[in-house]
Amino acid sequence: MADAARAARLADRIKVIVAQALERRVKDPRLGFVTVTDARVTNDLQHATLYYTVYGDEEQRADTARALESAKGVLRAEVGKNITARLTPTLTFVADEIPADAARLEELLRTAREKDAQVAEQAQGAQYAAGEDAYRTPSDEDDAEGPESAPRV
């Protein structure tokens, strides 16, 4: 088994090789505007998982997934030529969900900003229920304590 650092270096190298091969060698018309976002290699260097995003709608994403699946052999051969590992890892392509997650997070942040604005609007004319400083301070407690609460010796 290889160490994790070697697997990480190999994953970075595979990511670059596949991205360049998609740009230069694969001429499939189904292939949309693809960005390889991440690559991970198992510690035994046998399997590589490549994460990608596609700019476009669901149909373009599905077409790109089919194009990547059909070009897997060419891409694996290209990876095999350009790495120094004894065996060429198998390639698995996974659509990256980062754009969808980012849109969902953006929606949550927008909702939080709207609620903050509502709270600020409600607080505009509000008054304190127990005065501005509703908390006891140590000086207030000293004044409230009488001789009966003095420590016994």
UniProtKB/Swiss-Prot annotation:
GO molecular function terms attached to this record: ribosomal small subunit binding
Gene3D superfamilies: 3.30.300.20
Any Pfam family: RBFA
Region Disordered, annotated ranges: 116-153
Subcellular location: Cytoplasm
Compositional bias annotation for Low complexity: 119-132
Chief location bin: cytoplasm
HAMAP family, per the entry: RbfA
Record's protein name: Ribosome-binding factor A
Organism name: Kocuria rhizophila (strain ATCC 9341 / DSM 348 / NBRC 103217 / DC2201)
Name of the coding gene: rbfA
